[in-house]
Amino acid sequence: MQVTAHFLSVIYLLTLMLKRATKSYTKPNIIFQPTKIHIMFSKKHFHLLLFLSIVLNTIVQAQEKHYYQADFPIEEFEARRTKIFNEIGNNAIALIQSAPSVAGFKVFRQSNTFYYLCGLEEGHAYLLLNGKNRSTTLYLPHREEGREKSQGKILSVEDADLIIELTGVNRVRPIEFLGNDLVGTGLIKGSTPTLYTPFSPAETGNDSRDEILHGHARAAADPWDSQTTREARFIKLINERFPEFEVKDLSPLLDSMRLIKSEKEIEVIRKATEIAGLAIMEAMRSTKPGVYEYQLDAAAKYVFYQHGSQGDGYPAIIGGGTNAFMGHYFRKTDVLNNGDLVLMDYAPDYHNYTSDVTRIWPVNGTFNKEQTALYEYILAYSKALFKYIKPGTTANEVMDKAAADMKQYLVGKTFAKPAHLKAVENGIKFRGHFQHPVGMAVHDVGRVRGNVKLEPGMVFTIDPMIWIPEERLYIRIEDMAVVTETGVENLSAFVPSQISDVEKTIKEKGLTEFRPAKSLPLKKN
């Protein structure tokens, strides 16, 4: 009987089991060759070896599948691709790039669009959706044995059968066949065939499209660093190599699809929110005067990785005192001072989805009278906003009704300073408390503000906030809202927000209590 090389690791185990299974045991004659091992057993041992071989092969396949996502069934990816087929028609194709492979020893993270359509997390892959015959093909590079030996399993075109089983695509082809296959679609001979591909920049890791576009704009403004985006280069290549195709933007369709989350997506976002909440609670417990902002970051990251996150969904915003006044303060280099508030806005990248939760609390563990009045206003505003969220309404309608409630809330209320009263009155006029979608990116694609009708499956943040420029004081909390069939659910409601709950959590022991670390102030730029 001939046994291929992948059984080598269990030869010894098999012989031991055979020895126990038979009274008379003869040491097998093993002849080593460069690529295979020939083992001759007596006939009565054959069936036992065959059974064990099948078990081992099953284990190997299970290990290979470990490198593929387990959050979504094949049917969900197929349904997403079917929606694209329905929209582009039979005289068009859609072509989607994966993220490129990463240099050095960085961990690869797939682009959100590519992952959304097939779940595959390998670089330099292409997904072709042929509207003419409604078939789907994945194009992948060939196996790099040296890289696999160093890094572990990497799915390649040689794993075609496994990839078809995992993703539900019709075919898996070598990447060098893509050009000929575009011709082979037969559409080029037709009348004005269309090729759809995303024009918008691909999000990976802790990126959001709006921030990527800001980065592109800054680079374009630099006469020494003007860059062409990867998407623009891809579109240019398509136009040069296949001028017969009219190239159109697939991003608007993908954005509308991603705006409405499935039940499975909401499950993953819920888990990401739970991890974010636990991380913020750990940061609360680790807070005391003299602790550095970066130590709260470390406490939160510990919770992220402890619960299986692959990193952060966006850079942590942790600002003590006046640092919080900067809405996206990322440096985290200052010490936390007695009497100040500290704001944390942070969530993980969990299975390619994230969350967006913010809390603010007193460094010394107790809100003073001035802080209490302003903070309770923010709590009341959050409650008023959630009160009116339901299917069929709009953000503008929610904002109008909540603002009316807050005008009533202020009747009879007093604040310590005129600047504080002015801030809360301006807060009622501010239209940004109803914020942005959240999903695969923290500032996810699609729109929920203005006159967009809310639908079940939309996930976004409710983020009431006020600024007091005279004191460089900024106060806000942020929660995760998901529209249900009957109303709304606050996914982050469990994260302490009531004053008594926040103060109680701060008093609990945290990481910096039982695992003290020397605070090394970072050098400021």
Give, region by region, the residue ranges found by the protein language model.
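Bacterial N-terminal signal peptides
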Residues: L49-N57
